[in-house]
Each structure stands twice: as C-alpha cells, then as structure tokens.
C-alpha cells in the first residue's frame, strides 16, 4: 500500500510540476532540425491579458535570449503569442497604475523597473546575432510592437492588427515607437502615433515592420521548413552555426513560403493625403485639419469618408493632448539619434508620464472604471503655449541622480549608436 501511495504521489507531483510549467508567463521549448541543430521557440503565455508584457516576462525573455545566444546548437529562434487572438497587446499597465499614487516619488521605482527591463530587452533583440523570427498573428500593440521591431524576420497574417494607441491612455508611443514610427514612409508613422490608427498585415509590410505575408494556418509548415533547412551549410567543424549564414537560411526558407493575399493596405491607399496632412505645418496646423471634417474632405474626399480614417480621427479628437504633443516632439527630436539614444530618451519620458496626471487618468478611464471619459489635464492649445511647451520639454529631462538611470551604462565608453542595428 505504501509503495502504491508513493507512486501515486510521484505522479501527482509530476503533474503539478507540468501544470506549473505550462502556466509560466513565457514558455520555452526547442524543435530539432533534420541535421541535428535546434530551433528555439518562445511563447508569450498570458492569453487572458492578450499576452501583455510584464516585468517578469521581460526578464524571462532576456535570460533565455542570453542563454540561447551562447548555445551552439540553437540556430534560430521563433517568438509567438499563445492563443489565437493576439501576439502581444502591449504592456501590463495595471501594476503601473497602482504605482502611480499622488505621493509616489520621481522617478517612480516600479516605473523604473518596468521600463528599464522592457527597454533593455528591446536593445538586446535589435543587436541579437541569431535570427529572431516573429509570428505576428493577431493583435500587436504597444510593447508587442517593440518586440516586433526587434526581430530580424517578421511574418504577418490575415489576422494581424497593429497599432500604437497610447493617445487613448495619456502615455506616448513608447516601446521604441519613436524609433520605428520615424522610419515609416511618407510620415505615416507620425499619423499612426497621433491617431492610434489600427492597421493590418499589408500595412506592416509597407511600414517596414514585416517582411513576409502568410496565412494563420501556415505556422506548422513554416516550422517544418525551418527544421528541414540545411543548417550544416552554416556549421563549422566546432558545430557552431555562423550567424550571417543562419540569417540567409531563414530568409530563403521564409521566402519560399506561398505569399498570402492579405487585406488591402490603407497606408498604401492613402499615403499621399496622410503625407499632405502631416506636412500641413506644425502640430497646431495638423490639429486644425484633424478637428474639421470639411477640411479633411477638402484634403481628400475618399480619405476623409473612409471609416478607417474616421475611427482614427475620432481617436485623436478624444485622445490626450499631452500625448499628441509628446508624439510630435519625439518624432522630430529623434531623427538623428541612435536606437540606444532613442530608448534612453523614451525611458525619461515614460518615467515623467508615470509621475504626471494624464497617464493615470487615461488608464483609469479605459481599464479601471471603464467609463471612457478621461479628463485630460491640458488642451492642445495649452500644450502649444510657452508654458505648455516648457512642460512638454521637461519630459525629456533625465529625472535620475547621477549613476542611477536604468540605462545609464549605455552612455559609457562605447558611444551610443556605434553598433550595427537592424
């Protein structure tokens, strides 16, 4: 009887361990290739929150990336989200909200921890030597966009929906948004940052955020193609995969997949009126057009009357004016900055936002009380005044004492921007 009980206990304990492992916020496993190497699979595993990034998830991803970087058996990595709704719908901002009390210090310790880990992860991904393959199926927003931007090979599907909707919560397009929005063609990135417009997979390809259009049912075939690739071509006698060759192998395998027919790109259709709108003058001039239906129709009737545009414009009109001012300022401020300088600057802005009223008010209205009626602290006219501009510029100032900035070591002997970044 004792032996039977012991055996039963062992089985139950094993099941408990397996259940706990499957409940981890990020899952890691490997797939063997036909020629004896391994493909690492990283799965964001919080589908109930649409795989929103937490501090723990950033830490787990960073640790595993470091471990697999030095593992010669690992030739490429795949990053995906659990469930069929989202890859990653942003950051877990509820804990940030809880930390934003009226007597919280500047800089806020939790905001420092959250944004510090998040931005270090993005930097690590951008400079990662091995192929990072993004399975960009479903919703991708905020922090998920930062992960997307950091991957070397990005796949999108007919279900891909991406946005930088921070204007609705009083933050700003963070998560390296200032970096990748600036690099979109025809000032479409500025439009997306100001309006939080929702885009699709074809838009992602046009905006330099993705390279491959596939269907959501192609995942298994893609993994199989990667497993069957000839990784020995890039392996040395020490069984170490050459990273450049590995990138080429992944590119060939993905390019060989059937190209899916995705929904038409709104950015491709309307890039000209978007560019005209964003080039109409300063933020005040852009605002005049965005606030006036007749002015938008005069700019381009089809653009103005498209439900996609109308949703974007409505989001802007109800969004946070301070966010709009920060978005516009950052878009022009980062033009000549390196990725690391942009992340460093964004970390400053993020911590200031956590100390100022609009971010907390936006989260309250959207996620806590859910009344969707935020009371913003300033109008856009206030933001454009001399006092308002000083307030906006204060967000860029380093709020940390000397040596305490979470990304401060990036300003050491190695000059920012000196590394090759994708």
Residue map of PLM features:
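Substrate-recognition/cap regions that form aromatic- and gly/pro-loop-enriched pockets
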Residues: 286-364, 370
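Amphipathic alpha-helical blocks and their helix-capping loop/short-beta junctions
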Residues: 215-315
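Conserved CoA-thioester-binding segment of acyl-CoA-metabolizing enzymes
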Residues: 1-80, 414-422
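A structural preference for short, pocket-lining loop segments at secondary-structure junctions
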Residues: 37, 42-45, 60-105, 120, ...
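Glycine-rich beta-to-alpha active-site loop
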Residues: 125-169, 191-192, 196-197, 201, ...
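Hydrophobic/aromatic residues within transmembrane alpha-helices
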Residues: 79, 92, 147-148, 203-204, ...
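Contiguous mid-protein beta-loop-alpha structural module that forms a pocket-lining wall or clamp
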Residues: 176-240
